[in-house]
Amino acid sequence: MHHTQPSSVSITQVCETGEVYQLDEIKKISDVTHKHNLNMHMDGARFANALVSLDCSPAEMTWKSGIDVLSFGATKNGCLAAEAIIFFKKDLVGNVAFLMKRAGHLLSKMRFVSAQLDAYITNDVWLKNARRANDMGKRLSEGLNNHSDINLSYPTEANEVFATFPRNKIDHLNSEGYTINEDEWDGKAVRLVTAWNTKDNDVDEFLEILKKSN
């Protein structure tokens, strides 16, 4: 009575460590969630990156694995402030349009934001963008792995790389214009993110600068 009542379980795909939930993991979490009469939500801010990483269909990663509601993200894959809510259980829709309005998610001329999603999925642009970002993440991760004093914190499964750097390398990167936050200086993992428009030479230039700090 005096506590917030649970109504759903939410997972982030790709998750906060840059790792990807496998299909069987999503299914197991969903099964437990539904067993307790809760709804299963997926935060898909990097949905396309996860999809490319798993090489599966959108259906396999969502409703076939027990997802009830998906936040379909596009902002982190080439769009501007464009997201969509997808319900796989119609009875959950309810008054979501009113809630969106109340929460300030209906902008004036919203159609110009929404129109991006049409272009986003046409000719698999969203998957091509995600594949590029993931490939660059892998390229960066492999390059960092060549440094004995740099440790990868987690496996690189999409477009986020977490690694700890020695102070001399952080100082050198800062001097070259790559700003590393102070709270990441002393042995804490630095998050490096590659994007849909990251070029090979962007990654190679970063790695070359690191070599000069040895």
Segment roles from a protein language model:
Residues 1-176, 184-198, 206-213:
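Conserved PLP-enzyme active-site core in the AAT-like
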